[in-house]
Design a protein with these regions (language model features):
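Carbohydrate-binding surfaces in secreted/extracellular proteins
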Residues: 160-191, 316-326
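Secretory/extracellular carbohydrate-interaction modules
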Residues: 77-142
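Extracellular/secretory pathway-exposed regions associated with glycan biology
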Residues: 216-302, 372-376, 380-394
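Ligand-recognition surfaces built from glycine- and aromatic
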Residues: 194-231, 347-356, 386-389, 393-394
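Short, aromatic/His-centered strand-loop micro-motif at the edge of beta-sheets
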Residues: 143-166
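Short, solvent-exposed beta-strand-to-loop segments that form ligand-recognition rims
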Residues: 181-200, 326-339
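Aromatic-lined ligand-binding clefts that engage carbohydrates, nucleic acids, or primary amines
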Residues: 306-320, 364
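Short carbohydrate-recognition loop motifs
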Residues: 61-79
Length: 394
């Protein structure tokens, strides 16, 4: 559905041992299937009536396992069910869901419009209890779903296909906790990454949904302040960058380093966010086809030498140090053979290279091309001894 997940993220493959663990746990949970949805803890069920919901084309109100429900079909994944006359800021959202396809249903909250919202969704496979990407939080920012540059915001869950599953979200300020079928929180988001503070609530499919409850203000003591960035005191991360305007890059072409912007006025600061992520999507939104930006920074070295650097990016990268190319690679989820660990997501596991430094200032320039979902970069030195990291002003 255009307003929720225009391109639902595909699914990962996992090692056989993890799959067996997931199947075993899922089978144990499924041994006593729920004939009716589990009772929610607070609030009143919102009936699926025209005065309460705007249902997109193809969404039907049904009775399923003895309760009123809606079915959002696979064919209508780009259509959503929107709750009317609700502006949600903080509180609890609960619902029961039965998946009809591993693609899974999604919940949008703080929905300003189709391009800016917070999103929680499920990839409801039988191995969900072992799969690191069974559930995920990711925001839409400027029309881009940032799922592939935020792999740390996904998790396994006790989700079971072909029966009711109870999902509960508690939203408080910049924090989010998610429970699936009770127990401990399956997902704890220390800092929400979207740009909306309040907005609507809606669902996309495919799936069957029932017992939707919204309890404004019920945050269960969850601190609204964001949790700490675990990398904040790590001096190895390159965080201060300047970014160029966006240019198009023809398919199959490589960027011309000599044609990067030369005038200082064409570059603007783009500091790294949490965990050292340089979020290009937040600045420029959805690329129009294969697009390129340049990022640059200065590394000042006390003496000439070489540092090892870990790098994460989506989708293509070229690294230049003092005008010489030292690294290039591809991390493209669309082509399984070109996916870097972890499964095509942006991570410092994507790659590493030798960073040659001369004594004094060294200009590091990185070209990053993208045409698919999130667009970003991370760079971290293995050892920051003898270097000073600053943004380039040249």
């Amino acid at each position: 559905m255009d307003t929720m997940a225009p391109r639902q993220p595909p699914f990962s493959s996992f090692v056989a041992s993890a799959a067996l663990i997931g199947v075993a746990l899922a089978s144990a949970i499924a041994a006593s299937p729920q004939a009716t949805p589990p009772a929610a803890t607070a609030g009143a069920v919102i009936p699926f009536t025209p005065d309460r919901w705007e249902l997109g084309e193809g969404i039907t109100v049904i009775e399923h396992r003895g309760v009123q429900a809606i079915r959002i079909p696979q064919a209508q994944r780009r259509v959503e069910a929107l709750l009317k006359n609700v502006v949600f800021t903080n509180g609890t959202i609960e619902f029961d869901v039965e998946g009809t396809n591993p693609m899974g249903p999604a919940l949008a909250f703080r929905r300003r419009d189709p391009k800016d919202l917070e999103l929680f969704y499920l990839r409801g496979r039988p191995t969900c209890a072992a799969d690191v990407d069974c559930i995920q939080y990711a925001p839409f920012v400027k029309g881009v779903l940032l799922w592939d540059i935020l792999p740390e915001l996904q998790a396994p869950a006790r989700y079971v296909p072909d029966q009711w599953n109870h999902v509960k979200l508690v939203v408080s300020g910049q924090r989010l906790k998610v429970w699936v079928n009770g127990g401990a929180p399956a997902l704890d988001v220390a800092r929400l990454r979207g740009e909306t503070k309040d907005g609507g609530i809606g669902f996309s499919g495919p799936g069957i949904l029932a017992n939707v409850k919204v309890t404004p203000g019920a945050v269960e003591g969850l601190d609204p302040k964001p949790g700490p960035d675990p990398t904040a005191k790590d001096s190895r991360y390159v965080r201060a960058w300047m970014v160029s305007p966006v240019t198009t890059l023809a398919e199959g072409a490589t960027p011309d380093f000599g044609k990067r912007p030369m005038a200082t006025a064409e570059w603007t600061p783009l500091p790294a966010e949490t965990a050292g992520l340089v979020n290009i999507s937040r600045r420029y939104g959805l690329p129009d086809g294969r697009s390129l930006v340049w990022l640059k920074t200065t590394i000042r070295a006390a003496a000439a030498g070489e540092k090892r650097a870990a790098i994460g990016w989506n989708d293509e990268v070229w690294v230049f140090v003092n005008g010489k190319q030292v690294y290039a690679d591809v991390n493209d989820y669309r082509k399984p053979e070109l996916r870097k660990k972890p499964d095509g997501r942006l991570s410092l596991e994507n790659g590493s290279f030798a960073l040659p430094l001369q004594a004094g200032d060294n200009e590091v320039v990185v070209g990053v091309a993208n045409a698919f979902f999130g667009w970003g970069l991370m760079l971290r030195l293995d050892d920051a001894a003898g270097v000073t990291l600053t943004a380039s002003s040249r």
